């Protein structure tokens, strides 16, 4: 039967004593329940995505809410046809989201104004408003709010420097910020306020909540939302689907992410199935001929077959240029 599984996305900024021990105990608890997923635990709180059956996820939410620290924690729930992860990991970290600020931000003390989906939808359309995507470039490239700024960053910790370098774009504007589930914006919007930006708001519950809201139904979102599990992406806009992703090799509309087959590169690229085969899932010629190319290994290709494909590719590229 379809959709017997669920994926839970959640976070909570709350003080956790002895987070290392908590992480160890929590891993056992999750494994005993039969869950799979990835959970980060820090002194400042918890951030997780787990998958399991309806019964397993219900038990998990019930147990978590029975702990006074997590009794008001919001769980974002997605139906799924199976597990979204291969294993169960609970890891201790210094920070739930890595900003590495000299003076850390506690979102319970300083954060941007929370906007519910309808409020965010309306605010995006107002004058003197700038919408800043608080995610990484590869997340933006798969989908984003219409007109949102794409910070040129590969990791969240690079965002403060990018903001400082582009301060003139934001000064005197109303700033709206958003991320997948809301956790990055809790800190980022607080940091913006600390930097002197006065009018800062964040999408409460993130893109995931916006896409499920019965009123806005994901409107003004183009593309899909990147997620950090085996689903890779989830739909957001229930009214219209606009593909914004572009194939790495041809620039054609595409929403399929793969990792470069060279394990030393592992770059994420948007790529059609056809082009994955044509380019041996290598983002460059060097990656295609790499001795440890995983595509070659997975498909059991001989050296002769690899050479044949590379020659064909060379001919196609030569023909396209002439």
From Swiss-Prot:
GO MF entries: oxidoreductase activity, acting on paired donors, with incorporation or reduction of molecular oxygen
Family note: Belongs to the TrhO family.
Enzyme Commission code(s) on record: 1.14.-.-
InterPro entries from the UniProt entry: Rhodanese-like_dom, Rhodanese-like_dom_sf, Rhodanese_C, TrhO, TRHO_N
Name this protein carries in UniProt: tRNA uridine(34) hydroxylase
Segments crossing the lipid bilayer: none
Active site: 179
Catalytic activity as recorded in UniProt: uridine(34) in tRNA + AH2 + O2 = 5-hydroxyuridine(34) in tRNA + A + H2O
Classification via PANTHER family: RHODANESE-LIKE DOMAIN-CONTAINING PROTEIN 7-RELATED, THIOSULFATE SULFURTRANSFERASE/RHODANESE-LIKE DOMAIN-CONTAINING PROTEIN 2
HAMAP family (UniProt xref): TrhO
One GO biological process term: tRNA modification
Species this chain originates from: Bacillus licheniformis (strain ATCC 14580 / DSM 13 / JCM 2505 / CCUG 7422 / NBRC 12200 / NCIMB 9375 / NCTC 10341 / NRRL NRS-1264 / Gibson 46)
Role summary: Catalyzes oxygen-dependent 5-hydroxyuridine (ho5U) modification at position 34 in tRNAs.
Pfam families referenced in this protein's UniProt entry, alphabetically: Rhodanese (PF00581), Rhodanese_C (PF12368), UPF0176_N (PF17773)
Keyword annotations of the record: Oxidoreductase, tRNA processing
Root EC class: oxidoreductase
Residues annotated as domain Rhodanese: 125-219
């Amino acid at each position: 039967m379809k959709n017997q599984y669920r994926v839970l996305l959640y976070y909570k900024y709350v003080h956790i004593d002895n987070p290392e021990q908590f992480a160890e105990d929590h891993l056992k608890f999750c494994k005993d329940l039969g869950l799979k997923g990835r959970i980060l635990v820090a002194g400042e709180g918890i951030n997780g995505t787990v998958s399991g059956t309806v019964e397993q996820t219900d038990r998990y939410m019930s147990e978590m809410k029975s702990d006074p620290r997590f009794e008001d924690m919001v769980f974002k729930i997605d139906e799924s046809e199976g597990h979204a992860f291969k294993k169960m990991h609970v890891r201790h970290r210094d920070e739930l989201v890595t900003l590495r600020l000299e003076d850390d931000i506690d979102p319970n003390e300083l954060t941007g104004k929370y906007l519910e989906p309808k409020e965010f939808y309306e605010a995006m359309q107002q004058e003197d408003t700038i919408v800043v995507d608080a995610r990484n470039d590869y997340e933006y490239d798969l989908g984003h709010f219409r007109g949102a700024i794409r910070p040129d960053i590969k990791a969240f910790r690079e965002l403060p420097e990018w903001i400082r370098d582009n301060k003139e774009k934001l000064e005197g504007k109303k700033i709206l910020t958003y991320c997948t589930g809301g956790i990055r914006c809790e800190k980022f919007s607080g940091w913006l306020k600390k930097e002197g930006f006065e009018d800062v708001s964040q999408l409460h519950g993130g893109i995931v909540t916006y896409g499920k809201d019965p009123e806005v139904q994901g409107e003004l979102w183009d593309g899909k939302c990147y997620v950090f599990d085996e689903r890779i992406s989830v739909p957001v806009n229930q009214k219209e689907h606009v593909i914004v992703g572009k194939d790495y090799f041809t620039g054609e509309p595409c929403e399929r992410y793969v990792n470069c087959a060279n394990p030393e590169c592992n770059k994420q690229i948007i790529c059609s199935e056809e082009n994955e085969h044509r380019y041996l899932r290598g983002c460059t010629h060097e990656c295609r001929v790499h001795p440890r190319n995983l595509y070659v290994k997975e498909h059991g290709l001989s050296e002769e077959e690899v050479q044949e494909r590379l020659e064909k590719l060379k001919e196609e590229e030569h023909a396209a240029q002439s």
